[in-house]
Amino acid sequence: MTMITDSLAVVLQRRDWENPGVTQLNRLAAHPPFASWRNSEEARTDRPSQESRSLNGEWRFAWFPAPEAVPESWLERDLPDADTVIVPSNWQMHGYDAPIYTNVTYPIAVNPPYVPTENPTGCYSLTFNVDESWLQEGQTRIIFDGVNSAFHLWCNGRWVGYGQDSRLPSEFDLSAFLHAGENRLAVMVLRWSDGSYLEDQDMWRMSGIFRDVSLLHKPSTQISDFHVATHFNDDFSRAVLEADVQMYGELRDELRVTVSLWQGETQVASGTAPFGGEIIDERGGYADHVTLRLNVENPKLWSAEIPNLYRAVVELHTADGTLIEAEACDVGFREVRIENGLLLLNGKPLLIRGVNRHEHHPLHGQVMDEQTMVQDILLMKQNNFNAVRCSHYPNHPLWYTLCDHYGLYVVDEANIETHGMVPMNRLTDDPRWLPAMSERVTRMVQRDRNHPSVIIWSLGNESGHGANHDALYRWIKSVDPSRPVQYEGGGADTFATDIICPMYARVDEDQPFPAVPKWSIKKWLSLPGETRPLILCEYAHAMGNSLGGFAKYWQAFRQYPRLQGGFVWDWVDQSLIKYDENGNPWSAYGGDFGDTPNDRQFCMNGLVFADRTPHPALTEAKHQQQFFQFSLSGRTIEVTSEDLFRHSDNELLHWMVALDGKPLASGEVPLDVAPQGKQLIELPELPQPESAGQLWLTVHVVQPNATTWSAAGHISAWQQWRLAENLSVTLPSAPHAIPQLTTSETDFCIELDNKRWQFNRQSGFLSQMWIGDKKQLLTPLRDQFTRAPLDNDIGVSEATRIDPNAWVERWKAAGHYQAEAALLQCTADTLADAVLITTVHAWQHQGKTLFISRKTYRIDGSGQMAITVDVEVASNTPHPARIGLTCQLAQVAERVNWLGLGPQENYPDRLTAACFDRWDLPLSDMYTPYVFPSENGLRCGTRELNYGPHQWRGDFQFNISRYSQQQLMETSHRHLLHAEEGTWLNIDGFHMGIGGDDSWSPSVSAEFHLSAGSYHYQLLWCQK
């Protein structure tokens, strides 16, 4: 044990938090989570251990601007003005200090290993009693599962130790410091340490004791470490469970270790051996180690599809069977290897349907509870994810147990990121920082290697590539050859990775950055000598209204076997709840706490909102990742299973044929598909519709029974096909009265029955409509070529750093947002059966014509207004965001009904998950409440829209809400939006894609640009 004077002054003078060579003092060696059962049956059934005690709850707390401001007296007694906080928590979530959101830029001046003298410091204290029996024999430990960023610990006024690395446990032996009766802990937590330079992840920077704190009593002679591994014969019919056990304490001849393997109540195998390891070298082996190997016939294999778990119980006992201590862990029999360029699980090539996940809660910051963890896993499984990357640090220990149980493949990532360094590998190539990096990697492996869900180790994130990475790669491969190692830094394909794991590489487009080119994923596979699998560690940046082009990735993944999927960035929006002056909650992002530097809303890239409500993009991910694929030939549906191990046993295929959303025929067929197999389903003769319309066949795969992760009736996959249909023939209608045209100096007015249309002759716009005496418009109907910018449109552009390449800056510079209409023509003609209004507008900015819009409005005797629009786009202006019409309707109706793609928001490059049907939703559901307001709520492929007394027919896209594009563009947070009078309707003939390969460069694929130069669309507007 390292000895140090107990006084606070001496500790402060040492400044351990500014020494990369000091990562801990007196911290115990890493190991898997322990419970120290004294009853093997309790270990087998994973009952709460009587030897473990939680210290979570209310602690006394005092905050200081720097450690030097902490009074020495605090070591002995609580300060008179100390507050009470809950542990675990981040102190910023309790009003102390401010959370800081920054992506790349360090939140402190970069001068490693030194940190600011103004270093916020939290002083925690707790009094507690210890059971007398714990003091008589054995060792009492205290375990801090996570403290950010560094801390010193005192017990009863005596200094115990020091720890850093905020995402792994720090465990100390308290035995020598405890006494009978009341004991007092004092924990001084520093916000910044030299470790902060290794923790530059894209997340909120918070502080405090934010994971569990507990006491554990172990016997003097104890199990100090154990790890398990599984090995197989060629066909996986026989396995060996290898258990390596290490003890601490007096090494006696009578000591034995028994390892027993259980499947529920059944013991599958057992073995007993004395200590004494295998011969290592000419000096012998480890006297305190023993390795046992248990043979298992026909093991039930673990996978994310079928997460079969056994239970291994490790007993330390005497030769006569007297139990000293038991530890245990769940065991999954599975094998991970790379062979012939493929990542294999149990001999089958994986397709990673992955997502990156930060530990984030909108109310609790970085504190994770079991309910939130389970909620995340259930949502992932329900949306066809099978893998999660712990970005960018080891997670709460419980997370891995839950992933074992529910079935998720895990990339376990070391808590290392130096993104803000110039160059990025400034620390990772420096041998002085190797000890700190080594502890972060080796301790992660030692804690988590018993989990079957962990199939890949990661050396960290965005830290360049340095010699320290190479050393740690070799250490992992030596200690744990059963798992591949991945690391993206330095180009994603260095010698420190078994997997090509780029971030944001595109499907077909090279990004030839200097030193670290980012090739297209297809090209990467064909580079000379490259034989590794490619799995994107990050792709499809889901920031706000995003995930356009996602289907293109999945087409490539299914086409090229060595493209084995990737991890979407990312799972959850990292917004935090704040409260206004009236106590109302609102969602905050970077800068909202006065935090500088900050990266604004870049913390919100999730497929789900912070409260876990899904973004519409999540449905697109679910559909593209679905485990059943379909094809149609005639009346035969071919169903292909992409499950590798699971035979379908809880799936029904529901099919339905509908004409314009009206069902004509339906049925259901049980699915009986072998892993990676096919099933042909012959549909009956389908009825021929008597009328014209769109005829669609839709199939859904439904789970009739509940599972551990889904309710009964869960839909796991779906597909639609448009079928051959009758031609639409419009027969001459019976004669109607001809609308009456009247002309004044200012207007053309058309009147028919109780309806009137008014066109302003000066503007050329439809300025008003009446039904009876009720006005229908609050603003004229006019062309629209812009949208409230998406995050993907903005990129990295901001007021202090304009990116001229961003779409929004190109549109602004060209004048798209400022363009004004110059009327070139406005005429009215009475035809034999209708009135025809013709207008021509030139949309101009600073004397330049950007768009020319020619429109005709034909109002016939039935009261229908047929609008025909032809738009020419100037060749020297950026491709517009949309080509359409907009107006503010006077009505606010409760519901919206449409025939088209839905029900969720969809865009031209994100619509494969949308189905054609007749949909009916509340008006409020047509708006997507992105925290940073933007264009939202579009529905594509629309043939008919009904709202209030109005109906629109044609082939168009629309969104409808209480918020104008102008308000969305000018508002920084969704809670600041106010419902406007009436309803804003946007009807687009054409809409640009939204992109999503990344959010900092233009990422809309060329096929989704509005680049044609001239556009034509038609619309029929009538009243019901």
UniProtKB/Swiss-Prot annotation:
Binding site for Mg(2+) 1: 417, 419, 462
The keyword Magnesium appears for this protein: yes
Subunit-structure text: Homotetramer.
Lineage of source species: Bacteria, Pseudomonadati, Pseudomonadota, Gammaproteobacteria, Enterobacterales
Reaction(s) catalysed (UniProt annotation): Hydrolysis of terminal non-reducing beta-D-galactose residues in beta-D-galactosides
GO CC annotation: beta-galactosidase complex
Matches recorded under HAMAP family: Beta_gal (MF_01687)
Highest rank taxon of the organism: Bacteria
Keyword Metal-binding: yes
Cofactor: how bound: Binds 2 magnesium ions per monomer. Binds 1 sodium ion per monomer.
GO terms assigned for molecular function: beta-galactosidase activity; carbohydrate binding; magnesium ion binding
Signal peptide: none
Requisite cofactors: Mg(2+); Na(+)
Residue positions binding substrate: 103, 202, 462, 538-541, 605, 1000
InterPro entries: B-gal_small/dom_5 (IPR004199), Bact_Beta-galactosidase (IPR050347), Beta-gal/glucu_dom_sf (IPR036156), Gal_mutarotase_sf_dom (IPR011013), Galactose-bd-like_sf (IPR008979), GH-type_carb-bd (IPR014718), Glyco_hydro_2 (IPR006101), Glyco_hydro_2_AS (IPR023232)
Keywords linked to the UniProt accession: Glycosidase, Hydrolase, Magnesium, Metal-binding, Plasmid, Sodium
Organism: Klebsiella pneumoniae
SUPFAM superfamilies named among the record's database cross-references: (Trans)glycosidases, beta-Galactosidase/glucuronidase domain, Galactose mutarotase-like, Galactose-binding domain-like
Protein name: Beta-galactosidase
Active site, renumbered: 462, 538
Residues annotated for Na(+) binding in this entry: 202, 602, 605
Residues under site feature: Transition state stabilizer: 358, 392
The enzyme's E.C. designation: 3.2.1.23
